[in-house]
Amino acid sequence: MNIWHDLQPDLVRREEYTVFTANSMGSTARLSFDGDAGLLCLDHLSDSNIGAPNNTGFLPRTCTEDGLPIETILLCSQPLPAMTLVRCRPVGLIALHLEDGGTCNYIISAACADEFWSACLTVDEIPTATRKAIVRYLRYDQQLVRRPVSATEFCGLEQAEKYFDACQQNYLLRYCGKIPPQS
């Protein structure tokens, strides 16, 4: 089974979707997704004490411009093991503007089963300390792979949904041979 392709399509909708987790909250190991194998692989280990402030994961049946599933920051009160399936809904998006002119986007997702975070409806409701920790972690992570970040931007639910829709259409075109309808 390849989790990227074999998850039922109705479990991946823009308003609620299943995330498969990668990096556990607090971990200094950075796991990345191997699309061919459908598994996680160790990308690098952080030699500092900057661990993931939140769980991270990937959205099946989506495809970014890099040819990989959407990465997500998963707002959840507890660390979750890698490859756990979690029902989530989008809260917003964080865009990392890279010094080389590129952009790296992450959808910010709230775990539906988490009483605290499921009440968070917008990025504005994420506590400032949590937002700062996310930015610090993502900047450090990009620095480790030699992609320095020049600016970060928190965007609302509408931007997250547009990004999700574009990546889902890209997936359908690339892997299912479906041409998206013109709007």
Predicted regions and their residues:
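Hydrophobic N-terminal alpha-helices or hydrophobic patches in metabolic proteins across all domains
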Residues: 1-183
